[in-house]
Amino acid sequence: MIEDKGPRVTDYFVVAGLTDTSTLLDQEINRLDTKSTGPKAPITDIAIIIKSAGETVPEGYTCVEATPSALQANLNYGSLKSPELFLCYKRGRDKPPLTDIGVLYEGKERLIPGCEVILATPYGRCANVNNSSTTSQRIFITYRRAPPVRPQNSLAVTDICVIVTSKGETPPHTFCKVDKNLNCGMWGSSVFLCYKKSVPASNAIAYKAGLIFRYPEEDYESFPLSESDVPLFCLPMGATIECWDPETKYPLPVFSTFVLTGSSAKKVYGAAIQFYEPYSRELLSEKQLMHLGLLTPVERKMVSKSINTNKCICLLSHWPFFEAFRKFLMFIYKLSVSGPHPLPIEKHISHFMQNIPFPSPQRPRILVQLSVHDALILSQPVSTPLPLSGANFSTLLMNLGPENCATLLLFVLLESKILLHSLRPAVLTGVAEAVVAMIFPFQWQCPYIPLCPLSLAAVLSAPLPFIVGVDSRYFDLHDPPQDVVCIDLDTNMLYVSDEKKNMNWKQLPKKPCKNLLSTLKKLYPQLSSVHQKTQEGSAIDMTPIEADFSWQKKMTQLEMEIQEAFLRFMASILKGYRTYLRPITEAPSNKATAADSLFDRQGFLKSRDRAYAKFYTLLSKTQIFIRFIEECSFVSDKDTGLAFFDDCIEKLFPDKGTEKTDKVDFDSAEDTRLIELDDSQKSEHTVFIMPPEPPPDDGKDLSPKYSYKYFPRLDLKLFDRPQELKLCFSRHPTGNSITKSPPLMAKRTKQEIKTAHKLAKRCYTNPPQWAKCLFSHCYSLWFICLPAYVRVSHPKVRALQQAYDVLIKMRKTDVDPLDEVCYRVVMQLCGLWGHPVLAVRVLFEMKTARIKPNAITYGYYNKVVLESPWPSSTRSGIFLWTKVRNVVRGLAQFRQPLKKTVQRSQVSSISGGQSDQGYGSKDELIKDDAEIHVPEEQAARELITKTKMQTEEVCDASAIVAKHSQPSPEPHSPTEPPAWGSSIVKVPSGIFDVNSRKSSTGSISNVLFSTQDPVEDAVFGEATNLKKNGDRGEKRQKHFPERSCSFSSESRAGMLLKKSSLDSNSSEMAIMMGADAKILTAALTCPKTSLLHIARTHSFENVSCHLPDSRTCMSESTWNPEHRSSPVPEMLEESQELLEPVVDDVPKTTATVDTYESLLSDSNSNQSRDLKTVSKDLRNKRSSLYGIAKVVQREDVETGLDPLSLLATECTGGKTPDSEDKLFSPVIARNLADEIESYMNLKSPLGSKSSSMELHREENRESGMTTAFIHALERRSSLPLDHGSPAQENPESEKSSPAVSRSKTFTGRFKQQTPSRTHKERSTSLSALVRSSPHGSLGSVVNSLSGLKLDNILSGPKIDVLKSGMKQAATVASKMWVAVASAYSYSDDEEETNRDYSFPAGLEDHILGENISPNTSISGLVPSELTQSNTSLGSSSSSGDVGKLHYPTGEVPFPRGMKGQDFEKSDHGSSQNTSMSSIYQNCAMEVLMSSCSQCRACGALVYDEEIMAGWTADDSNLNTACPFCKSNFLPLLNIEFKDLRGSASFFLKPSTSGDSLQSGSIPLANESLEHKPVSSLAEPDLINFMDFPKHNQIITEETGSAVEPSDEIKRASGDVQTMKISSVPNSLSKRNVSLTRSHSVGGPLQNIDFTQRPFHGISTVSLPNSLQEVVDPLGKRPNPPPVSVPYLSPLVLRKELESLLENEGDQVIHTSSFINQHPIIFWNLVWYFRRLDLPSNLPGLILTSEHCNEGVQLPLSSLSQDSKLVYIQLLWDNINLHQEPREPLYVSWRNFNSEKKSSLLSEEQQETSTLVETIRQSIQHNNVLKPINLLSQQMKPGMKRQRSLYREILFLSLVSLGRENIDIEAFDNEYGIAYNSLSSEILERLQKIDAPPSASVEWCRKCFGAPLI
């Protein structure tokens, strides 16, 4: 067997003919009814006799007495006085026969040359046959005789008859009518002559043909040669031995084609040439000689006649290249009768079969030069969704005419027996193929033999429908059966039995038939003109090749137009049929596949035209219709064709085809082209193939020459051995090379690709549509990668559920799918992994989205439902446990109101907006919008429910309730926005950018700056004044987002600092963390410290389990003013709310809860405790985060919830000026000792989880919740802060929350620390801190604990380290606190503008302050606690990014090790707490990505949404258009890495002291990959700090004053102004040692004395490298070098991705080579998946890639786990590209904010500071004009700028006021109005880049949301 290597032009070369074993054909056909007469001799003479004159029939003649219907055959039939004329004929072989008979109208026509006229009768009378008077014109009969020497196969007249058409007679079968009436008089009937032509029968013996030779000898695997059948089709009339007259010439070869249909309905096309060769007389027996007439019967004398036999050479192929094959076979035949030739025939055959490449789209034409004079062209088959066929519609129409074609269509549709016949065998196959193709989408189901061999003619008697083609000579031997419809292609006639006489085209539905006929009648004349032109002299005007090309082009065009006419007809009669398909929606029964179960036949019939009910009824009962319904209902190889047919119906009848009619805006149906040529068909690209090389001529004439007289016996030795076919030009093999998985699931049909291309072109001109088109393509990318994602996911059900959730998310976010690939892939995966119920849900989701599944999707759906195992019973364990869960949840709901009231009384909280969203948070954000007005209780309830569901454990209900009582998450806060019109600043509690994105008006009323919730206001009032709070919030918000907002310090430390992760919005954080992130966000918003911790924990865990869901939860949460007081509760509430909305949107909502749950579960035993803690933290967070959005930032955190912060607060409480703002009720604090103890237990692998849990339980539930939350936050400390969250939510709260940020993530500042908060809050923070990072956190804790008697508190071996550290720290702490507090308060104040809820700070603080009880009054807590939180220790110092936030003391970042702990849990089975810190700690790599690019032409910075708007609808164009100079350039994605694996924290091993927060590097399975990485990164910072318990320096965070970094550190950090850490050897306790880490910078907070923390490295994702270098004694790994790849439009990326997967299989996505070999596709996918918050395992490839491991490819372990270790931040700006001397305003603001000592600022800095402050205030008052004027005044005329005023003001607003508080749409409106109102003087000073963004840019941002700034 020969292996198949892709498409071949030809498969086999065959020679057939007479063999030694051939049997007589008569034996084969004796069974048939043969005519008794046998073949007749041809007619040699005709005559006219006048019977009325007494003339008789001449001798030897036969008179035609009667017509076929037995009327008198009088040529003047029906005339009154005319003579009776009759026609006589004579047969014989003695002279040449007649070849034609005609009628001559004398005087009107001239006689054709070669014809003779019968002027007289044999008796001399005039032979005028006209019945009119003698005076009128005469009519004579003419004839033409064959020449004496003629070819054997020439036709002759073999029969003659007369018909009277006025009596209804028609020509008999196979007779040709002479279309001239013989009677032209007034009277008489219409009489016509008919005659039949055939090949005169010679003496012959017919045998069954056999195989003489084949090449190659071996069979192909896919198509073995049938050696017995093929020869029959090569010689359908048999292999004959014939005896010819001596003067007979050899006929020219006859070309014929045939089709072999295999059992699988696959067609093989044959092209054959028949010719004659002499046969030796010696080989004949006497019997044969007698039969042939070569031996006289009596004398036995030999007769001198020639003996010949026929032979055939044939090519077999899967492709109908009939014309090319004809030319090649003729070339071979000519070689066989000529010579000499340098090469044998065998060489030419093997060259053609092996060396000719298959035509491909790149090389659509192959010109094969066979010899000097012979060439042929192979053209790529027309690529349409219609089935491939050898149909020749033009031949069909030319031979039958329009009306006969329509009648034939009726017969085929109603499944009649159809017999096609012609004397031209080459015509039969093309016409038969056209007859079968014209009923598309139906497929003929019965016997189909286009050229039937005589030996198979018995099929004509079969009792079932068939389409068969035969040679017309068959009728010389046999009469056709009565019930067969015979179509004579030679005479353009249809012959029908009597019962079908009345069946014709008029029975077809009127309108469709009328349209069909009109089109065919229009095309009919064009066909004849094309044929005439090509015959007439085209060869004279152009070369044969050119003539060939042009003729082929015209014919192809006509072919398609004819085929399209039939396609329109079929679409018209079947329109709307999909409505009547019945999907299987339950476990299938035996009758599920019956046609009546699958299709509503009665409904379909009722919807059709009643006048044609009979036609439709008959049609619906045919096999073709029933099969069509089955193919529509199940997967079949016809699916692409059926989908194309559905598209045709939709184009022609937009109202009937689908419900989704908005896509159809085509021209009128008449003009719509249904079949379109590929571009490749129009291509002139031709490959030239030379003939085989002759042997070298060395002049000695030794090389043999080949000369032939007849066709030789071929010698296999002379053939070239079959090589592998050269597929250099060929397309990829049709068989998929993909192993294991089914062929590319997400593959689009060609039609879908074309439709998407058209749609994109149409959308391109419409800004909203263009943005949605890009958005939709991005979702498609995710679904294309889904099969691979599911394959590496465990369990599969969760991955499938995630996919389903994404589908719901798409619908809810108004994504208009470009095709059905998304749904189809999910359905196929449901089948692959056996989840039919989910497939049913997907189908109903399609219906909900008003999308009608096309044939492909519907087929896969039914296949899945039919073949997959259905669950046996609803009473499964899952079902029963679900019932239990519902009962428990119901009980919890009843308890909520009670707890809420308690909480409210206890807590006064600031409401926070959502913190940054998790990976999948966008959806949630949007949802939040809707939920903004949901009451807090409801939100809380939802949150609780979800949380419970996810954990599947009953968490402390009270804690949850507390959460609920907290202010509802940000989303809700917008309810209270002021009534100002289009205000830029939203309500503080407003969500991030998402909310505004979803609807600029929404509840926000398009406010530029949102107002706070009433609750928020109250809280703010408590805190101090709104203004202060706002500032704080701003600062705080800054922190979290800032952290990862910028690229690394290496590239530009300053940039990084500014963009540090802290800057990143909480939403970013959320994005990274998944659902947990959202929770974190909320937490941040509340008391920053505890929230931070909480958030961290939450997001990581949630992320791991259910990224999307958890995220959703977060976003959706609302803040309730009442609840704001307790940060933790708020957070929980928020998450709940988020969850619920998400749930509506997508199951992912549940995921949020799950995430939350998973966080808890991450630390297995810790789960319950953590959960409690989380809820508490959430509450706290909420309060502290004024807007959840700000939660992540801890800028405002004055008093952290973490133990350190609390301690600090206690110590410095009174000292902080802002402390009043931050009064936290002491209730929040928990028992510090308990917390620490439990925390330690958690961390240590040996510690008993239960004990730690008990400790938590002992504390009030709220505290427990807080603690958990805090942990989460801790984890998150490294997460970026939400930009939005900071200032936007509530200025006041921001200010108040200035507590020290613990981690970079939490850059909250706590301006004032609330004494009341001190004790308990601190303890909370401490415990949280400890949990997250036993060592590092502890250190910070110690600092804050200065006031506590740690000896008493701490006991047991685990606490030894903590004790010693704390003692030392305590002494220093009080002093440090003062400094730190002051610094913080300063930054807090700035931040106040931002608002407490700045995500980062709040979140971290919360995390740290796990102990804080939810009840604690959060108003105070927010600012101070956040500031205090130790977690954010390193954040403020680390980088400017953190911005102004100093988290000197409180910021001790939790080492990422926390995350490691989670890993450890899974690895070592120890239950570690899953606090945010741990999440951060588990982060091994932070990846910062920005699409901001620089235009090559004008140098301007072009941002993401501008790049999107500049892309074109061309899926091959990589360029975008610069919005300013309109030039094209290639945008780039810039990627930077912060490798945190070298940090000790990441690799911490569990230690006896329980400090091993950084337990393994392996995340828990339940943690979501993406989130984890983020958190772990941040965490390590915090944790590092735990190594040196003494170094709690940053604890000062709580105090409110920041420690000044030492000069060395300042130098080291470069622009990182926030970093004010001095590396203190052992005295970490020194205040100056505070570390700030900026997410974007990427350095660790290692300013702390590393000597003391040998095993935890602080890994700060965004810390500046310089910082890392200075601080990291461990010798952290160098960061991998940055990467830049082209930023591809989703259209281009999709095309490339599909091509890649088709060539390499979809498993390539999750192989280690993907990132190395396809970096462009990889990074673009990572960018888009992250952009849309879609779960993905791709980030896991980053960790093991060569690039990130110094050129060594590490083995892949667990993608899902590794992905959790990578935190990806998408940055809006790229400071590395900034080339202006002045730094961006938002960077300046961050820097001023972080260093809050105005006395230290230079004069220039002071001016800038004033400018920035003025702009901020203007924006708050909705005034954009003033900032434009101020900035324009500062511009130097004529100096080219990169940064536009628009970006300067917008970015400053987002960073300083909090991203969640800015309505970007409102800002755009205000900016546009202000710009248009500028005076011409100012406009002259402005540049093009300062113009407002275009509508297209705005829509792209609205669709995709804004990245982090």
From Swiss-Prot:
<dbReference type="GO" id="GO:0015031">
    <property type="term" value="P:protein transport"/>
</dbReference>
<keyword id="KW-0963">Cytoplasm</keyword>
<dbReference type="GO" id="GO:0072659">
    <property type="term" value="P:protein localization to plasma membrane"/>
</dbReference>
<feature type="modified residue" description="Phosphoserine">
    <location>
        <position position="1046"/>
    </location>
</feature>
<keyword id="KW-0813">Transport</keyword>
<dbReference type="GO" id="GO:0005794">
    <property type="term" value="C:Golgi apparatus"/>
</dbReference>
<feature type="modified residue" description="Phosphoserine">
    <location>
        <position position="741"/>
    </location>
</feature>
<dbReference type="InterPro" id="IPR043153">
    <property type="entry name" value="DENN_C"/>
</dbReference>
<dbReference type="GO" id="GO:0005085">
    <property type="term" value="F:guanyl-nucleotide exchange factor activity"/>
</dbReference>
<feature type="modified residue" description="Phosphoserine">
    <location>
        <position position="1623"/>
    </location>
</feature>
<dbReference type="InterPro" id="IPR023341">
    <property type="entry name" value="MABP"/>
</dbReference>
<dbReference type="Pfam" id="PF03456">
    <property type="entry name" value="uDENN"/>
</dbReference>
<feature type="modified residue" description="Phosphoserine">
    <location>
        <position position="996"/>
    </location>
</feature>
<dbReference type="InterPro" id="IPR037516">
    <property type="entry name" value="Tripartite_DENN"/>
</dbReference>
<keyword id="KW-0344">Guanine-nucleotide releasing factor</keyword>
<protein>
    <recommendedName>
        <fullName>DENN domain-containing protein 4C</fullName>
    </recommendedName>
</protein>
<feature type="modified residue" description="Phosphoserine">
    <location>
        <position position="1244"/>
    </location>
</feature>
<feature type="compositionally biased region" description="Polar residues">
    <location>
        <begin position="1296"/>
        <end position="1316"/>
    </location>
</feature>
<dbReference type="GO" id="GO:0030659">
    <property type="term" value="C:cytoplasmic vesicle membrane"/>
</dbReference>
<feature type="domain" description="MABP">
    <location>
        <begin position="40"/>
        <end position="199"/>
    </location>
</feature>
<feature type="compositionally biased region" description="Basic and acidic residues">
    <location>
        <begin position="1459"/>
        <end position="1468"/>
    </location>
</feature>
<keyword id="KW-0653">Protein transport</keyword>
<feature type="modified residue" description="Phosphoserine">
    <location>
        <position position="1629"/>
    </location>
</feature>
<feature type="modified residue" description="Phosphoserine">
    <location>
        <position position="1627"/>
    </location>
</feature>
<dbReference type="InterPro" id="IPR051696">
    <property type="entry name" value="DENN_Domain_GEFs"/>
</dbReference>
<feature type="modified residue" description="Phosphoserine">
    <location>
        <position position="989"/>
    </location>
</feature>
<feature type="domain" description="cDENN">
    <location>
        <begin position="385"/>
        <end position="521"/>
    </location>
</feature>
<dbReference type="InterPro" id="IPR001194">
    <property type="entry name" value="cDENN_dom"/>
</dbReference>
<dbReference type="GO" id="GO:0031410">
    <property type="term" value="C:cytoplasmic vesicle"/>
</dbReference>
<feature type="modified residue" description="Phosphoserine">
    <location>
        <position position="1061"/>
    </location>
</feature>
<feature type="modified residue" description="Phosphoserine">
    <location>
        <position position="1099"/>
    </location>
</feature>
<feature type="modified residue" description="Phosphoserine">
    <location>
        <position position="968"/>
    </location>
</feature>
<keyword id="KW-0472">Membrane</keyword>
<feature type="region of interest" description="Disordered">
    <location>
        <begin position="1419"/>
        <end position="1474"/>
    </location>
</feature>
<dbReference type="Pfam" id="PF02141">
    <property type="entry name" value="DENN"/>
</dbReference>
<dbReference type="GO" id="GO:0043231">
    <property type="term" value="C:intracellular membrane-bounded organelle"/>
</dbReference>
<feature type="modified residue" description="Phosphoserine">
    <location>
        <position position="1278"/>
    </location>
</feature>
<feature type="compositionally biased region" description="Low complexity">
    <location>
        <begin position="1426"/>
        <end position="1440"/>
    </location>
</feature>
<feature type="modified residue" description="Phosphoserine">
    <location>
        <position position="1225"/>
    </location>
</feature>
<feature type="modified residue" description="Phosphoserine">
    <location>
        <position position="1640"/>
    </location>
</feature>
<feature type="modified residue" description="Phosphoserine">
    <location>
        <position position="737"/>
    </location>
</feature>
<feature type="modified residue" description="Phosphoserine">
    <location>
        <position position="1184"/>
    </location>
</feature>
